[in-house]
UniProtKB/Swiss-Prot annotation:
Gene expressing this chain: ohgt
Protein role: Substrate recognition component of a DCX (DDB1-CUL4-X-box) E3 protein ligase complex that mediates the ubiquitination and subsequent proteasomal degradation of target proteins. Has an essential role in mediating growth by negatively regulating insulin signaling. It also has a role in maintaining presynaptic function in the neuromuscular junction synapses of third-instar larvae.
Record: residues binding Zn(2+): 458, 461, 527, 530
Assembly information from the UniProt record: Likely a component of a DCX (DDB1-CUL4-X-box) protein ligase complex. May interact with pic/DDB1.
Acidic residues composition-biased segments: 75-85
Polar residues biased stretches: 41-50, 86-96
Source organism per UniProt: Drosophila yakuba
The protein's name: Protein cereblon
UniProt record similarity statement: Belongs to the CRBN family.
Amino acid sequence: MDDEETSEINSVQGQDEDVQLEVQPQAQGPQDRQVDAIEQAWNNATQDEQSPPAEEAFQDPLAIDGEGGNAPEAMVEDVLQDDTASEGSHPSSDMSLETPGSEDDSDLELLPRWMIPQNRLRSAVDMMVSQARNRDGGIAALLNRDNFLQRVRSIVFSQERRRSRTSEETSQEAADAEQPNDPPPQQPPRPPIDIGFDTNLPAEHSYFGNHLSRVPGVDYLEVGSVHHMLIFLHQHILFPGEVLPFMIDGRMFDEDMPGLDGLIFGVGFPLMQPPEDNPLKLYGVTCQIYERGESGRGLVFYKSRALQRIVINCEDIQGSPQYIARNPTSKCFSKVKILPEYFLPEPLQSVEMGSMARFRDIPSMRDKYRRFQLSTTTWPSDACQEYSFASIVERARQRLESQKIDTMPKCPIQLSFWLVRNLHLTEKMMRLTFLTDSVNTRLQLIKSTFKDESLFFCRYCNSSLAHCADLFAMSKHGVQTQYCNPDGYIHETNTVYRVMSHAIGYSGEPSTKFSWFPGYQWHIILCKFCAQHVGWEFKAVQPNLTPRVFFGLAGSSVRIGKASENTPFNGSTYVVRNMLRLISNEME
């Protein structure tokens, strides 16, 4: 808070001292008196303007349209200018992506009316006041916290600058106000991608160093068997076949590692909602360590691979399970049950054709043989084609052709899990595919998403960031891979070769240290709308690497949704809602 506001508050405290003494001590303490003084200062600063009635001031701030809000336009200007930059402010904090001198008060005249409605802004301020009453420090602490109103103002200006980039956006603003749910614009054509990079390097997680030693042994446990093992938690959903790198205190494992065989442990997923009929179930996977090495900081690097799906009865857990990415300090054990994987062959393969079966594998005779088989059954050809494993594989191959992936597994069980990771399903669909024991059902669920056009949305403000069609593989494991940062946090990273125009900002300075992609520097990127971390930009520092620039979106910060879902493309109608969400987050 600057000196002018402080002196004004002190003067108000002196003028209203008699009024404050009339309040009962039981109902108002020193903190509440300070809150009332700041509220009075706020009212004095705007007393020359016509304020809306009390019932209008507390209208639902999440509504987009509504009556009321008759305060003049000067009210908007007063509130925005109330928290301008001062000696104690931080205009270039993590919520502001522009330079300190980029805000010009003349921009206030250019603010579109839908951007920050008068009555909604007043309601937002009233909500800040009402929610801050019971917080430590009250409103004074809120106003002192990194100059919050200035940061909200910066976000509003950032939105306006993005809107005014092209000549078409002036006319588009009126259309957005009247029809906020217009379909998103068409995806721009995808140029050909030339990858001049060894995709084996990210898969080997070479940023851990070259001193890792191989731990032999890959053990698959019997389906339906129950085992007692060490368990951890993980913030993402892993599917069998994925690699999980992590850093942890070596004492957590070394005592339990049997000889030279890799240790098998369990990883549970709290995000995997259990069935309603049995809420005490925790689903996860078994992981086996296959490489280890010293980090030099008291921690040990481990590489593990997810092997089989498991289910854990929460009543059998001994101890408090901890997240594997948060440097667990205590061991937790539990009984785990290995879940089955059922696969039924294609319907026509179960039809016995006697001596004619020898024509099945001859390419030139395959179609004729299939037609002859269909003529001997009561099944229509469409039904057989619908459940054909080869048909699903071919359609998946065509969909992934542009992603430069040539490591598609042939085993149906492994393929079903591999497709989930590389086709980018919604969270609901990922849970369904994980919970099913039938490989055929899993493939049918995956097939149902082939026609969907999906986008990456910011998980915090629903702004669209990138098209899922722009995914490509910078690792031999596919477009989605788990990586570990120097602090041990595990990021699920999705590689795309471009993001939407004006969708991101940058934080900090680029660096090549601990780069997941050797030869590339990384730079933290933020959502341009809410300034939350959403991933990294990777830029080549060696002249022979291609692509020169690509992006990695953090799975914990983005979500996948259909392009047709009822979400504004640039978050235009969510401006006030997300301002309030930011206010709420700042007070927590």
